[in-house]
């Protein structure tokens, strides 16, 4: 019988493989979701460094949100990461959802980043 941990690992491997196939030297917008917060980073895999990041732990964002773990918070982080990425000169990224299903907070972050001007 396949455990849920195995299913999650397979999903993550499948997503990473597809990202490598379509990346074409574009930076990767990586999302990490915890029970309390949500984090986003734009990572340049060629240089091996993080270009910009945003999370609900940042003080200015934390003050304006009632919770760091809802869709509203994810939307705010998506807007912020798009703004910072555009300021750093990044317009096109590859969305890396990891093993998370494209639904709820992950989807809200992605849609906000698209509204903010990132294309993926």
Curated annotation (Swiss-Prot):
GO terms for biological process: translation. It comes from the Bacteria. The gene is rplR. Part of the 50S ribosomal subunit; part of the 5S rRNA/L5/L18/L25 subcomplex. Contacts the 5S and 23S rRNAs. HAMAP family: Ribosomal_uL18_B. Belongs to the universal ribosomal protein uL18 family. GO terms for cellular component: cytosolic large ribosomal subunit. It comes from Bartonella tribocorum (strain CIP 105476 / IBS 506). The lineage of its organism: Bacteria, Pseudomonadati, Pseudomonadota, Alphaproteobacteria, Hyphomicrobiales. InterPro entries: Ribosomal_uL18_bac-type (IPR004389), Ribosomal_uL18_bac/euk (IPR005484). SUPFAM superfamilies: Translational machinery components. Keywords: Ribonucleoprotein, Ribosomal protein, RNA-binding, rRNA-binding. One of its GO terms (molecular function) is structural constituent of ribosome. This is Large ribosomal subunit protein uL18. This is one of the proteins that bind and probably mediate the attachment of the 5S RNA into the large ribosomal subunit, where it forms part of the central protuberance.
